[in-house]
Swiss-Prot record:
<dbReference type="GO" id="GO:0005737">
    <property type="term" value="C:cytoplasm"/>
</dbReference>
<dbReference type="GO" id="GO:0000028">
    <property type="term" value="P:ribosomal small subunit assembly"/>
</dbReference>
<dbReference type="InterPro" id="IPR005732">
    <property type="entry name" value="Ribosomal_uS19_bac-type"/>
</dbReference>
<dbReference type="InterPro" id="IPR020934">
    <property type="entry name" value="Ribosomal_uS19_CS"/>
</dbReference>
<dbReference type="GO" id="GO:0019843">
    <property type="term" value="F:rRNA binding"/>
</dbReference>
<dbReference type="Pfam" id="PF00203">
    <property type="entry name" value="Ribosomal_S19"/>
</dbReference>
<dbReference type="GO" id="GO:0006412">
    <property type="term" value="P:translation"/>
</dbReference>
<dbReference type="GO" id="GO:0015935">
    <property type="term" value="C:small ribosomal subunit"/>
</dbReference>
<keyword id="KW-0694">RNA-binding</keyword>
<dbReference type="GO" id="GO:0003735">
    <property type="term" value="F:structural constituent of ribosome"/>
</dbReference>
<keyword id="KW-0687">Ribonucleoprotein</keyword>
<comment type="similarity">
    <text>Belongs to the universal ribosomal protein uS19 family.</text>
</comment>
<dbReference type="InterPro" id="IPR023575">
    <property type="entry name" value="Ribosomal_uS19_SF"/>
</dbReference>
<keyword id="KW-0699">rRNA-binding</keyword>
<protein>
    <recommendedName>
        <fullName>Small ribosomal subunit protein uS19</fullName>
    </recommendedName>
</protein>
<keyword id="KW-0689">Ribosomal protein</keyword>
<dbReference type="InterPro" id="IPR002222">
    <property type="entry name" value="Ribosomal_uS19"/>
</dbReference>
Length: 93
């Protein structure tokens, strides 16, 4: 269920301060964050975030069509290594 419109979008305070600082000073350095739950706002377009996926930081460049989504959606936490091969078929050959 989506968030109520009267509440507005959620962005962690510390992340909001970093974004405001970057916009004021025209600073285009990567903003490192653990806040996967923060929503991407229109003023974040053009900035690059390093979003933590539980192991390392994944660089995410924010474009216009990402507005309204959360930062964590663009930094996957699980890696798929493929299913195990069938051992019986290897033995017959």
């Amino acid at each position: 269920m989506p968030r109520s419109l009267k509440k507005g979008p959620f962005v962690d305070d510390h992340l909001e301060k970093k974004v405001a600082y970057a916009l004021e000073n025209k600073d285009r350095r990567v903003i490192k964050t653990w806040s996967r739950r923060s929503m991407i706002l229109p003023e974040m377009v053009g900035l690059t975030f390093a979003v933590h996926n539980g192991k390392k930081f994944i660089p995410v460049f924010v474009s216009e069509n990402m507005v309204g989504h959360k930062l964590g959606e663009f930094a996957p936490t699980r890696t798929f290594h493929g299913h195990a091969a069938d051992k019986k078929s290897k033995v017959k050959k």
